[in-house]
From Swiss-Prot:
One of its GO terms (biological process) is G protein-coupled receptor signaling pathway. InterPro entries: ARM-like (IPR011989), ARM-type_fold (IPR016024), Chaperone_Ric-8_A/B (IPR008376), Gua_nucleotide_exch_fac_Ric8 (IPR019318). This is Chaperone Ric-8A. GO terms for molecular function: G-protein alpha-subunit binding; guanyl-nucleotide exchange factor activity; protein folding chaperone. It comes from Xenopus tropicalis.
Amino acid sequence: MDPGTLLDKLESGDQELVQKALAEYNQENSQCFFFNAEQREERKKLGELVIKFLNRDLQPSCQMACLETIRILSRDKHALSPFTGRSAIQTLAQYAGLDYSEEMEMPSIPDGESAVEALKGLCNIIYNSVEAQEVAKELRLVCGLARRLKLYNETRSSHESKFFDLRLLFLLTALSVDMRKQLAQELRGVSLLTDALESTLALKWSDIYEVVTDRLAPPLGKEETERVMEILKTLFNITFDISRREVDEEDAALYRHLAAILRHCLLRQCDGEDRTEEFHGHTVNLLVNLPLMCLDVLLTPKVEQGSVEYMGMNMDTVEVLIQFLDRRLDRGHKLRETLTPVLNLLTESSRVHRETRKFLRAKVLPPLRDVKNRPEVGNTLRNKLVRLMTHVDTDVKHCAAEFLFVLCKENVSRFVKYTGYGNAAGLLAARGLLAGGRGEGRYSEDEDTDTEEYREAKPNINPVTGRVEEKQPNPMDGMTEEQKEYEAMKLVNMFDKLSREQIIQPMGVTSDGRLEPLDEAAQKMLQRQESSDLESDSD
C-alpha cells in the first residue's frame, strides 16, 4: 500500500479502517530497512498521524498496529522528526511503561506485545537521533529502566520485555555521557546490573567469591545469553574509567563479586562456537575495566578434578583466556577491537600475579629450541605475537610487544632472544632501552633456562633476525685498499644525499638508551668541546 492511500485512511479516524490499513502496510514493509528518498515527506506525515492516533483511546489491536508502524518508520534516520520531540518520546515511554516521576512508588511492569513494540521503536529512535537522546535524558528514562530492573526477580516478565529493556539501557548509556554517569553514580548501576547478571545466570555460591560451576551443565540458553550480553555491554559502559581511580573497600568488594561472576561466564559455553566467542568477548572487555586488585578472585577457586593447575593455583580462567587469544589471533579480523582487550588483560594480570605470568610464559615463551627460523615464522603463539610487533596498527603492535616484554620480566636481553632485535626495536626505543637493561617493573630474579639446542647455536644467532643465518661471503674479499675506500666513500655520499633530501634521518643511541638525531648529537658534542676549551683557556 502506498503512503498516500494510507494517509487518507488514517485521516478518516476510523479505528477499524486504520488498523487494517496499518496491518497491511506493516506486513508489506516488515523486512524493509532501506527507504527511498522520494516518499520521505509522506513517511514523515504518516509518522505524525500515527503518533497522534496513539494518544486516543484505542483498541489493543489498533495500538499494536500503530506501534509496529512506528518501529518500521523509525528505521529511516532521515525521517525521524515526528518521533524525536518530547511529546512523541513521552507517548512511547508510556506505552513501554517507562514514564518516570519521583512520586511513583512502583514502576509499571508491562508485559504485553504493545510494550515490547514501544521499546523496539524507542531503541531505533534513540540510536538514530541525538535530539531523542536529549529528550530521553530530560524524561529520565534511565531511572524508569533502573526501577524496573530491580523488580525482575519478583515479576514474570517475558524474555522480549526484559531484553529490550536492557537493549534500551545499553543504548542510552552508550550514547550519552550524562545518562552513563546517572546510572553509574546516582542509581548505583554496577550493583543493580550485577544483581541482574547473577539472577539471569541463576548462580549458586560455594564461597564468598566462588561460584559453583558445573562442568557437565548444558550450554547457556539462547535467551539467557542474549540478556547476559546486554548486561555485560551496559556494565562496560559504566565502568570504563574505574580502573584509573581509587576504589574504597565497599566498591572493591562489589568489583570482586562481579569478577567472580565473570570468571563463571568465561567457563560457560553457549549454543554454538560463534555465540560462545561473542559471549566471552564481552566478558573479557568488562574484565579489562575492573581494578587489577580485584582480579585475584580469578585464581582463588580451589583446584578440583579436571582443573588446570599450576604452582598449586587454579588456572582454568587463564587457560580459557589464552585459548581465546589464540583463536582471535587466527581470525585476524579487526585486531584492534578484538585482540587488544584480551592482550591488555593478560599483560596487566601478568604484572601483578607471579603465578599467572609464569603460567603464561610456559605457554607463550617455552624454552627456545627453534633457532633456524625467524621468531615471526611459524604457528606457535610466540610466532603469531611476534608478527604483530610490526603490525601497521600502532595499538596492536604496542599491545603485543608489551605482553611479550612483561612475560620476559622486562629484561631486554631475554626479550631480544625471543623476538629478535629487529622486532623488538620499536618497544625498546619507546622505553629508552635500546642500550639494554631492564624496564621499570619489579620481578623475581629467577634465571632464564636455555635449552641445549639454544646454547649450541647461540654464538651463531643473528641478534637482529633472531635466528642462525647462513654464512655469507664477505663482499670485500679480493678488493684492494683503494677499492674498499672508494666503496666506503660512495656509501657515505649516498647516506649524505638521502639525509640532506630528508628521505632518512640518521639516528644514534644516547647514553640513556633513547634515539637522537646524529646532527643534534654532533652539535652537543661540539658545544661540550667548546666549553671545555674555554675552561682550559681560563686556566
